Amino acid sequence: MILKAKYIDMDAGEYTAVLHYDDCEELGVREQDRVKIKHERAEITAILQTTDTAVKKGEVGLLGNAYTAAKVEPEEELEVIYTPKPESVSYIRKKMRGEELTSEEIRSLVNDISQHNLSQVEMSAYVTSLYINGMNLRETADLTMAMVESGETIEFDTAIFDFHSVGGCPGNKVTPVVVSIVAAAGLTIPKTSSRAISSAAGTADIVEVFSPVAFDSSRLKKLAETVGGTLAWGGSMNLAPADDIIIRVEYPLGVDPHAQLLASVMSKKKAVGANFLVMDIPMG
């Protein structure tokens, strides 16, 4: 089906397309189905929402992040076709049953997460399955490597030091102090941090009060090489991008499953080439 693009100025986390009820009936799709949005410059998979007022018949509304990812122009003609659920949804159900995932299943799951092929509902089921059933050490290692491979890596010509606090305790924001001390000692520490997951504010939220924290990976590398240390938001660059998508689901649930926490930390550290790492696990 060929439809005209319409920009909708809002985001829903996942890539979202909005179709008129009549077009949905003709296409044979319903709310929460997936559709592929295609044109000569790009294609994305989006989760479908339906309306009889927000878009007209013959239009496809794309919410902010989907519109940007699809690289479309206003009223540009797009091909919209139904696409089935990815195989990785069955892997989520497998983990919900408490079964072990293979390396290939984990890699496929992480790839679908990073490509925005899973809905928020499916992502929530994934996070909940890890919170209840966990992962063994082999699965966690495979999850870590799959997350690293899903994005960019940064290479430095010197030894890289890093620090991570798992957080969760209000007021425990030691990272800015540690990074400052390490950088003042002449060592290189390209620190990336997350926003809040299970507490009121993450390190990136705190630091952003007095300094910008959003940089791309090339800017992060230049800053680290120039001044020795950085305090940056990991979600602003393409380092283990699946992790930041998962964090957005963990936050409203207020959970951070142990296997996901470990994979999150280690994937970001490996992505910046850390040689030495200090982990802080606060109690209280």
Predicted regions and their residues:
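Long, compositionally biased stretches
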Residues: M1-R97
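A glycine-rich helix N-cap at a beta->alpha junction
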Residues: I206-T230
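Glycine/serine-rich anion-binding loops at beta->alpha junctions
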Residues: I160-A183, L187-S199
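Helix-rich terminal scaffold detector
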Residues: E208, G273-G284
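General beta-strand structural signal in soluble alpha/beta enzymes
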Residues: F156, D162-F163, I189-S193, D216, ...
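A glycine- and small-aliphatic-rich helix-loop capping segment at beta-alpha/alpha-beta transitions
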Residues: A146-E149, V174-G186, D205-F215, R248-P252
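Acidic, glycine/proline-rich low-complexity segments that act as flexible tails and inter-domain linkers
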Residues: P84-P170, V209-F210
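Phosphate/diphosphate-binding glycine-rich loops and adjacent basic-rich segments that engage nucleotide
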Residues: E225-V272, F276
